[in-house]
Amino acid sequence: MARGFGRKKFCRFTVEGVKEIDYKDLDTLKSYITETGKIVPSRITGTSAKYQRQLSTAIKRARYLALLPYTDQHK
């Protein structure tokens, strides 16, 4: 089993000094959702726990308001 020696992940929101993640910022939210519509976990993205909670809440609010889809396009 090969072990990866990639770069250390960092929280983008901490580096940029973001106070709170907004559900209306769709460009940011789309980068944390997979093609199937799932929220990408923090162990993959490197997002800190504080911002991961805010991110998931913002994505769920955007889904509820139909700004983001719940699932992918079933074709």
UniProtKB/Swiss-Prot annotation:
It comes from the Bacteria. InterPro entries: Ribosomal_bS18 (IPR001648), Ribosomal_bS18_CS (IPR018275), Ribosomal_bS18_sf (IPR036870). PROSITE patterns: RIBOSOMAL_S18. One of its GO terms (cellular component) is cytosolic small ribosomal subunit. GO terms for biological process: translation. GO terms for molecular function: small ribosomal subunit rRNA binding; structural constituent of ribosome. It holds the Pfam family Ribosomal_S18. Keywords: Ribonucleoprotein, Ribosomal protein, RNA-binding, rRNA-binding. NCBIfam families: S18 (TIGR00165). HAMAP family: Ribosomal_bS18. Belongs to the bacterial ribosomal protein bS18 family. Part of the 30S ribosomal subunit. Forms a tight heterodimer with protein bS6. Binds as a heterodimer with protein bS6 to the central domain of the 16S rRNA, where it helps stabilize the platform of the 30S subunit. PANTHER family: 30S RIBOSOMAL PROTEIN S18 (PTHR13479), SMALL RIBOSOMAL SUBUNIT PROTEIN BS18M (PTHR13479:SF40). This is Small ribosomal subunit protein bS18. It comes from Hydrogenovibrio crunogenus (strain DSM 25203 / XCL-2) (Thiomicrospira crunogena).
